């Protein structure tokens, strides 16, 4: 796969040997790729492939309020597009998810009194958004239309437990 990407990025062509064809990229062709530092795959990117990308590191939001605001805005835009039969999520439920994610990422509770095991997954802001969106769908289609902890729990489990063996102690 990496060799194919190098050809595409360097020569701006996609060879298709089975069809004895090559497809030339149009002007302005770009590839945008994302990666998480904690979410590593089986093979690291080769140095040749790394040289063909510009790396932009996006840190996690500095404060919990900043992260809550990001999640709230993205969830509201998702809800508007999907037209879910659920009420606008309560800020307290978004705060609950973001707090759980931040505490697990940091390996300690917000007050610093209790140490926690960190999971193998990233628990990114994007995953928090996904958990709340999933909870909204659950509450809208299978619940009473009001987002609550019961609607969120399956999404939280899925985000936290990426490796059932390694993450068993966390859950």
Question: Each predicted region: which residue ranges?
Answer:
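C-terminal engagement/docking regions of AAA+ P-loop ATPases
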Residues: 140-171
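Residue-identity detector for glutamine
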Residues: 2, 24, 106, 166-168
């Amino acid at each position: 796969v990496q060799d194919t990407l190098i050809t595409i990025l360097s020569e701006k062509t996609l060879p298709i040997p089975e069809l004895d064809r090559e497809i030339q990229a149009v002007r302005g062709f770009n590839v945008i790729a994302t990666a998480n530092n904690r979410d590593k795959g089986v093979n690291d990117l080769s140095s040749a492939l790394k040289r063909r990308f510009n790396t932009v590191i996006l840190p996690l939001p500095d404060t919990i309020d900043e992260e809550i605001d990001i999640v709230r805005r993205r969830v509201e835009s998702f809800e508007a597009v999907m037209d879910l039969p659920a009420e606008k999520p309560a800020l307290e439920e978004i705060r609950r998810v973001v707090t759980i994610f931040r505490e697990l990422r940091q390996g300690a509770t917000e007050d610093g009194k209790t140490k926690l095991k960190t999971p193998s997954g990233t628990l990114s802001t994007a995953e928090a958004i996904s958990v709340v969106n999933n909870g909204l769908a659950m509450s809208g289609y299978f619940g009473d239309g009001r987002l609550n902890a019961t609607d969120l729990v399956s999404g939280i489990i899925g985000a936290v437990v990426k490796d059932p063996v390694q993450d068993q102690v966390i859950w």
